[in-house]
A protein has these predicted regions:
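Short, surface-exposed connector motifs at secondary-structure boundaries
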Residues: 3, 135-141, 152-154, 164-166
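Outer-membrane beta-barrel proteins
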Residues: 4, 13-19, 75-81, 91-92, ...
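Transmembrane beta-strands of outer-membrane beta-barrel proteins
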Residues: 4-8, 64-68, 139-141, 157, ...
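Transmembrane beta-strands of outer-membrane beta-barrel pores
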Residues: 10-14, 53-55, 70-78, 143-149, ...
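Residue-level signature of outer-membrane beta-barrel architecture
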Residues: 53-55, 131, 137, 145, ...
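Solvent-exposed loop/turn segments connecting transmembrane beta-strands
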Residues: 119, 123, 146-156, 178
Length: 185
């Protein structure tokens, strides 16, 4: 027996930036007052299968809970260029003034050179063991390994304990390693 959990989730965040009631001074009177500065899009798909089962073991105050699972995650980051007027220099560009096409990072549009589309795949598995070894003392151990298509593999472990001193007071502690892959952005 035991319990299975099969899941899949997808999410996307999209930020589009526009300039309204403004101009690119280097284009003078020919500058439109409204233009697209570009957009950033992050998408993620998470899928996995988890399994959990309790095993009665003599000498333990509770069943040993064994949880295991596998996951797949896809991540994508896209940066799309804005209208060329948002980042190009027009015929009235004057390098001796602060005017022109804007200061980089301040209302400057995303250029064709900045445009990108990157993604990665992540595969992982885990195993988690947990039980009350005596009344009011719960202990456990977990291990997880993940492989990133763009960054390599990592394996991390965790040891944890929880002691119920009284119904109002609980002492918890854990020791673990951790890892976070660099952002795609």
């Amino acid at each position: 027996s035991g319990k299975y959990d099969l899941y899949a989730t997808y999410g996307q965040n999209k930020v589009s930036t526009e300039q309204g009631n403004g101009i690119n001074p280097s284009y003078g009177a020919d500058s439109p007052s409204h233009y697209d500065l570009g957009e950033n899009i992050f998408a993620q798909l998470n899928t996995g299968l988890d399994y959990s089962r309790d095993f009665a073991i003599d000498g333990l105050a509770s069943p040993l809970t064994v949880s295991t699972g596998a996951l797949y995650r896809w991540e994508q980051y896209k940066q799309n260029a804005g209208d060329p007027i948002a980042y190009t220099r027009g015929p009235y560009f004057n390098p001796s003034t602060a005017l022109g096409t804007g200061i980089p990072g301040i209302n400057a549009g995303i250029t064709d050179q900045d445009q990108r589309k990157i993604s990665r795949d992540v595969y992982g598995i885990y195993l988690d063991l947990e039980a009350d070894i005596v009344k009011d003392l719960n202990v456990g151990a977990a291990i997880r390994t993940e492989k990133y298509s763009d960054f390599g593999s990592t394996t991390n472990g965790k040891l944890f304990a929880k002691y119920d001193i009284s119904p109002q007071l609980t002492l918890r502690g854990s020791v673990n390693t951790g890892y976070r892959a660099p952002s795609l952005a």
